[in-house]
Amino acid sequence: MAWAAIFRASIPWSRKYNQSGELFQIEGHCRSACTLFLAIRNVCIDRNATLLFQAGHNRQREMTNSATSHMLGAYNAALREHVIAKHYMETLAFHAIFGREMIQKFGHRACPK
């Protein structure tokens, strides 16, 4: 868990929301880098959202271990284990997890209706 805490503190937008306590909502289609918002302590996920996971990459779309590790650092342990076990982080193909599953299976907070 220490790496997740370091990750959260190192990102300015994450720090802003974590300090303010303001709720950050993930809604709609959340592709790849958008999943970094999962690092925000006060994040919630809309039940109808779709989050798309893939390996981290550089600007040339070449997969890199450092970018993938950076992304994995935004995820809680259960989600991190799932995306690793399913090999989602080994390809640039998108792998969808729906908001309902993020809430029920991985313990993320549901956004208020």
Where do the PLM segments sit?
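Amphipathic, alpha-helical segments enriched in basic
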Residues: 5, 13, 26-28, 78
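Short, well-ordered helical secondary-structure segments
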Residues: 11-13, 17, 33, 38, ...
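Extended, non-globular alpha-helical segments
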Residues: 1-19
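Charged, glycine-interspersed solvent-exposed loop segments at helix/strand-loop junctions
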Residues: 15-21, 61-113
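Soluble non-cytosolic domains of exported or imported proteins
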Residues: 4-8, 28-32, 66-69, 97
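Glycine-rich beta-to-alpha active-site loop
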Residues: 22-60, 64
